[in-house]
Amino acid sequence: MRRTLMAICLCLSIAMGWAQTEGRYDKGSVPVVNGRVMLQETIYTTLGQAESYDRISQWAQQRFSKPKVIVSKFTSNDATNHTLSLTAEEYVVFANRFFVLDRTRINYWVEIQCTEQGATIKMTRINYWYEEEREGGLKFSAEEFITDDAAFNKKGKLLKDQGKFRRGTIDLFDNLVEEINNVLTQ
């Protein structure tokens, strides 16, 4: 009886671990605000508003320069309101194996608003250019491809093609948030 109970507990804990691996890509992880996909995160810090803005501005100048991005343009760098916004285009690599490079160009807009409590990062206006080498490739927006309605089948399972774009976009945003968090906690 005791061994059976231990085996059941072990199986349940393993199953729970597997279930949590895809959790950050599940339904609800790509919010749509006013018809646009908008990923948003707030990072809290003990730094002042001006100090946070200065650190993030320096980080952004380095992060959004070549060769890390294809092209970027700062649309607003407002030191008085402590707001930074830019557009960027870079590659998201899905697979990089011998003779196989599966990637897409992602074009997005980022706004970073610094407050006394921390910084809010928003990523929106996301567009993709997939397989650009093949007859011009495919161009589409995040609203057409990675929203809950487009990325999941009727049974609630993440579709293969939409899934890789959804995972790549969420991972890119999470990477930006992690980098900003590291800058603010140094």
Task: Please tell me what each predicted stretch does.
Residues 1-23:
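Bacterial Sec-dependent N-terminal signal peptides
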Residues 20-186:
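Ser/Thr-rich, low-complexity intrinsically disordered terminal regions
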